[in-house]
Amino acid sequence: MKKRVRVPDLVRMKQQGEPIVALTAYDYTLARLVDAADVDLVLVGDSLGMVVQGHETTLPVTLDEMIYHTRAVARGCQRALVVLDMPFGSTQNGPERTFEQAARAMKESGAAAIKLEGGQAMAATVAYLTERAIPVIGHLGLTPQSVHAFGGFKIQGRDQAAAQRIADDALALQQAGAGAIILEGIPAALAQQVSQSLTIPTIGIGAGVGCDGQVLVIYDMLGLYGDLAPKFVKRYLDGVPVIGGAIGAYVQEVRNRQFPTPDHSFEK
């Protein structure tokens, strides 16, 4: 059996200059494929609210739903570090209440770490969690749970003050004990600067090549949304015509009584 990745391994990978590979997953079947490909970190993101549930934002996702999906993903991962994304409203009620939520989430889901959004305002909470054996991955930049405060899904850190705030937030999270930080939707130069200033790794999504690792939403990189994927996504499969074509072929064969054939039937 392969050695399971833990949060300290991510720090070691940064120290050795080894890029960290991360992807999202939301179910057992895709988690098995991702894990078999030696992905280092599997994030069960609250992005499932959009790509699985069909919401316009991540905000409607509940902690119970995150636990449900993470439990399925954890069953499919033998090596990858499984991280549960704490949904909107589960980390904003102070360190003690957040600890209760996070401890329950890890206990019931099988996750080995949790992710939460926010910088200096969340530093006390991050410290409280890490002091109590809950590994934390931070998330800065275009944090989806703040979509309404941002006025939409907009690139962050473009002016000097905003860039400095992100850099200060990253340092605060590191000092609070975060094991890694996701940098999303910020200029590549800023992401590289932040990455070089930290001893913990950064994992970028729409943040350029200067981060210590990369993460993508798996449905985006598999091309399951046609032309709706963000600019920073590279499609490694054009999934809509491939999967849509397979479904269409099945429909036609059933309607034409071409399926099932004797090869797919039982005689006795």
Curated annotation (Swiss-Prot):
Binds 1 Mg(2+) ion per subunit. Keywords: Cytoplasm, Magnesium, Metal-binding, Pantothenate biosynthesis, Transferase. It comes from the Bacteria. The keyword Magnesium applies. One of its GO terms (cellular component) is cytoplasm. InterPro entries: Pantoate_hydroxy_MeTrfase, Pyrv/PenolPyrv_kinase-like_dom, Pyrv_kinase-like_dom_sf. The active site is at 184 (proton acceptor). Its cofactor is Mg(2+). It catalyses: 3-methyl-2-oxobutanoate + (6R)-5,10-methylene-5,6,7,8-tetrahydrofolate + H2O = 2-dehydropantoate + (6S)-5,6,7,8-tetrahydrofolate. One of its GO terms (molecular function) is magnesium ion binding. It is found in: Cytoplasm. Pfam families: Pantoate_transf (PF02548). Belongs to the PanB family. Catalyzes the reversible reaction in which hydroxymethyl group from 5,10-methylenetetrahydrofolate is transferred onto alpha-ketoisovalerate to form ketopantoate. This is 3-methyl-2-oxobutanoate hydroxymethyltransferase. It comes from Magnetococcus marinus (strain ATCC BAA-1437 / JCM 17883 / MC-1).
